């Protein structure tokens, strides 16, 4: 395996990954991944020791998918994630849904493919118009094209079902996860303290609301995918330096030259059973005692907990026992 991106606990803290929701909004199934409850803010603090291990495991899975020339679909339709998901998926030559998940996008792929062909046809008609359409007709065509582009633009070149999903916010994207489970497509997802872990094969506990945290995770995934592409190109004898700096674009030109074993069945068989919940809801988080005078300030505040002032918060060190302060 090639070199996966390296991260430390401090990197996660600086990205605000540790910040959970208000304690009253938690999902008990997330208890194993919660360090405790902040003494003054009444928000859950995610155990970054577990996040670090599970992040590496998830990145290893995505690396293997891409190394076998599989497709990864980024899914994040919430406002905070939309632009980041599109940018990072595009940067690593993968696919995304960032506007709205259409029911049946995976389970009814033939119909979706037909809609993609309509999108291409609309673009052809608009671009090659030689006076056969009036301005009003062109506006109507462009409106239909725009609607299809928002929903399908990120998967128009996918050419088939993805081999893995990377999901931001499992509560919002539950339909996508359910469809992936039906088709035994592995799901990698960011799980916040209010998330439902059911159906997620490779969970990554973390803040799924902060732009900074979402950007951190998406960049980690895109960097991993690019590393897998570099490794595949190198093993195929491709001179990466000669191809230029755009590794993803270079890869697209060589991906169809050699056949690889499909990875969807392989990964699904090797991962946890879809829909299973290997979590311990009976275990609840304890209150973390911290000293606000000795501890470092929380680097970020949650957009949905705006009433909690970030400058008053402190973070317990995930690397030491409960009750210790981050010096």
From Swiss-Prot:
Pfam families cross-referenced by the UniProt entry: Ribosomal_S2
GO molecular function (one): structural constituent of ribosome
GO biological process: translation
Keyword Repeat among UniProt keywords: no
Gene Ontology CC: cytosolic small ribosomal subunit
Source superkingdom: Bacteria
CDD domains documented for this protein: RPS2
Protein name: Small ribosomal subunit protein uS2
Organism: Anaplasma marginale (strain St. Maries)
